[in-house]
Each structure stands twice: as structure tokens, then as C-alpha cells.
A protein has these predicted regions:
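Transmembrane beta-strands of outer-membrane beta-barrel proteins
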Residues: 33-35, 122-124, 170-172, 260-266, ...
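Short loop/turn motifs that connect adjacent beta-strands in outer-membrane beta-barrel proteins
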Residues: 26-31, 118-119, 134, 167, ...
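Outer-membrane beta-barrel pore domains and translocons
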Residues: 36-40, 127-129, 175-177, 250, ...
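Hydrophobic core residues within well-ordered beta-strands of beta-rich domains
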Residues: 31, 107, 120, 154-156, ...
């Protein structure tokens, strides 16, 4: 809703419009169960085709020659890029195809149940979602050491409606979700994609021929290559859990005067996040040429390996919400009118990782009072009056 008159009853928070969300409720009748399982294969977004090592080196030579500079690679070196007879110093790596899969699977499962009688009705829903990552991983790692960018989420919801009396309705609701996100240790998505687009095919081999992990040796800055960064530096786990509960009481006061109604809502929500990072790094080497005596590669260790380290953290908050509404609508012949009063109270407080700042442990509160008066004659002439505080 964006009409100023319609949103005025929601106070200042409705200034930019109001979105009303209605969740499914139970229906009287026999139990009804719906189940659905889906799977899909998602192909990766179209990525650019990069030139190979020989083309890249040849274009580099052409760019230098047109500027009256000497060639970076001699013909015999270009031949090594083509034949890959010396991949330690003349590599040819398609980083995009090495790191990214062509596609990945997604799974969806959903279960809904509803039913009940004339007095009580219920609706229960549960769902599971899994999106597998599109990064290739090192299959020699342990099964519980996953460096892919996976996502899993569990959702649940339960709504119960109880007719306490013919004029009194009690609504109970609880909903929540638990989500887990996995990612490579030292290469988040932004960093890894930057490496895939920024690393040229001759910057560094994936590994040296003796199995050493390389550091970029064609840059003034030492950098991990994309494969080492995405598969050999550990992994990150992020968990997020949120629970939303609400109680609604609807009381019809037609026995006092027709059209008089009271609705009271109370909500209590919690939102918690936990993360754990387990990082490691192998020995990283730089090849500085070959020995004139033996012809063997001379390696320089640039960074020493360190075993898996662990860091963790968490955050959390809770929110309480109270909404009281009293309304009266009545028609007398061609005259139609209504009066509505609404009181809202919202409180939010951090519960985890509040630190030493006293303000972090204090609730943020908001109170509002709003009202609305409407009148129309024969649905032709309308008068609305709204206020909010």
C-alpha cells in the first residue's frame, strides 16, 4: 500500500509504503499433506573466453614492438608456450576452466500439512534447500574439508488458529530458518573472481613440476595463484539462525455495538549468526631460474606453511513487538463511517558480542500512536482524517 490515507494508520514507519504479508492458515477438514521434491542443474553464467598462453605472449610482443620496445619473448620461448615442454617457466593455464565447473546441482524439498476442526485449525510447513557450489575442489582433501561455495537452508513454519468462543479467535505462529554457507578460506567470492579475471595464463603454473605451490613470479607483488587460494587455504563456515513467534488475539464486540473489534498482536523474534574460519597455507615458492651446472630449478621459499588455525565469532539480537488496534465500522443507510486507533511498540536489543560500550546493551525502542476517521455518503463523497505520533 502506498496511498497516504491507507498507510497513515501505520504511523511514521508507513511513510514509504506498507507491504502486508499474509501467511497460509489451516482450514477445517481432513488432514491434507502436500510434498514436493525438485532438482535442477544450474549452468554457470557465460564467462569470457581468454586467450591461451602462446597468444597472450605473442600479443605482448606485438604491443611492445609497436612502442619501439624490445620483445618480451623470443621465438624459442614462444615455442615453449606452444609445446609446454617447460611448464614451470612457460605455463599455459586457463584459470577460468580450472577453477569453475560447468554447472552445479540444486535441490528443493517441501512438505505442507493443514487440517483441523471447527474449533482449531493448523498449518505446518517445512522445507530444505541446497545449492552446490561451482568451484572445483581438491579431491585429495578429507571429506569434511570442503572448500566449495555451498549453501544449505532449512525453513519451518507452524500456524494454529483456535476459536476460544464464537467471538474470540486466538492465533499462534512460529517460523524460523537455519542456514549454512561455506566458502574457500582465503579467497572470498569477490577476491577469487578478481583473480580469475586478473591472472593471465602465463603468470604462474598451477603447481611446479616437483609439487611445490607457486607464488606469482611474473608480478612485482607476491600473490597466490587462484587454485592455491581456492583449494589449499582452508574454509569458512557461516551459520545463521532466526526464529519468529507471534500471538494474535481477535475479539469481536458486536454484542456491545455492531462493528466494534479489537486485535492485539505480540511478537518475539531472535536472530543469531555464528561463523568459524579455519585457515591454512602451504609452503609457497618462487622459481628463480635453473642451475647452470645441473639444470635443476632453483627454488626460493617465499612463505612458510602454517597448520590449520581457527577463529570464530558470533552476533545476535532479539526483537519484541506489540500492536494493539481498536476499530469500529458501521453503516446507517447511505452513511458509512469508521474509527480506528492503533498503538505500536517495538524494542530491539543486541544479545551477543555487545563489547564494552554500554550503548550496545541498551534496547532501541520505538512507540507510536495513530488514528483514523473515515466517512462517506453513498460511496460518492469521502472524508478521511488521520493522525500519527
Amino acid at each position: 500500500m502506498k496511498d497516504a490515507s491507507a498507510t497513515a494508520i501505520y504511523g511514521s514507519k508507513g511513510a514509504n509504503g506498507v507491504v502486508l504479508i499474509t501467511t497460509k492458515r489451516g482450514k477445517a477438514g481432513k488432514i491434507n499433506i502436500d510434498a514436493k521434491v525438485e532438482t535442477s542443474y544450474n549452468t554457470r553464467t557465460i564467462t569470457p573466453e581468454f586467450v591461451d598462453g602462446l597468444s597472450y605472449a605473442s600479443l605482448m610482443n606485438e604491443a611492445l614492438v609497436t612502442r619501439n620496445l624490445g620483445m618480451a619473448y623470443q621465438p624459442e620461448e614462444l615455442e615453449l608456450f606452444r609445446t609446454q615442454m617447460d611448464p614451470d617457466f612457460y605455463p599455459n593455464v586457463d584459470w577460468m576452466d580450472l577453477i569453475l565447473k560447468n554447472g552445479a546441482w540444486s535441490y528443493r524439498a517441501n512438505l505442507n500439512m493443514n487440517g483441523g476442526g471447527n474449533t482449531a485449525r493448523y498449518f505446518v510447513s517445512a522445507s530444505y534447500t541446497e545449492d552446490q557450489g561451482m568451484y572445483n575442489t581438491d579431491q585429495t582433501l578429507r571429506d569434511d574439508y570442503d572448500t566449495n561455495a555451498n549453501y544449505k537452508k532449512w525453513n519451518y513454519r507452524m500456524n494454529v488458529d483456535i476459536d476460544i468462543t464464537k467471538s474470540t479467535l486466538l492465533k499462534l505462529g512460529i517460523a524460523g530458518s537455519l542456514a549454512k554457507r561455506n566458502s574457500p578460506g582465503l579467497a572470498d567470492n569477490e577476491m577469487l573472481w578478481g583473480m580469475l579475471f586478473g591472472y593471465n595464463p602465463i603468470a604462474t603454473p598451477v603447481y611446479y613440476s616437483n609439487g611445490y605451490a607457486p607464488i606469482s613470479h611474473r608480478d612485482n607483488v607476491n600473490k597466490l595463484n587462484p587454485w592455491v587460494a581456492s583449494t589449499q587455504t582452508g574454509y569458512n563456515e557461516d551459520w545463521q539462525n532466526n526464529v519468529q513467534t507471534n500471538v494474535t488475539l481477535e475479539q469481536n464486540f458486536d454484542f456491545i455495538t455492531k462493528g466494534l473489534k479489537f486485535v492485539g498482536r505480540f511478537g518475539y523474534d531472535t536472530d543469531n549468526s555464528n561463523w568459524i574460519n579455519r585457515h591454512r597455507q602451504p609452503d609457497l615458492y618462487k622459481a628463480n631460474g635453473r642451475s647452470q651446472e645441473t639444470g635443476e630449478i632453483i627454488y626460493e621459499k617465499m612463505f612458510s606453511a602454517y597448520d590449520m588455525t581457527q577463529s570464530s565469532g558470533s552476533s545476535g539480537k532479539r526483537r519484541e513487538f506489540l500492536d494493539l488496534l481498536l476499530s469500529w465500522e458501521r453503516a446507517f443507510g447511505n452513511h458509512h463511517g469508521g474509527v480506528t486507533f492503533r498503538y505500536t511498540q517495538d524494542s530491539e536489543k543486541r544479545t551477543v558480542d555487545i563489547g564494552t560500550d554500554i550503548k550496545n546493551g541498551v534496547s532501541k525502542r520505538n512507540q507510536g500512536l495513530a488514528g483514523r476517521f473515515t466517512y462517506n455518503w453513498n460511496y460518492r463523497y469521502f472524508v478521511d482524517f488521520n493522525f500519527g505520533y
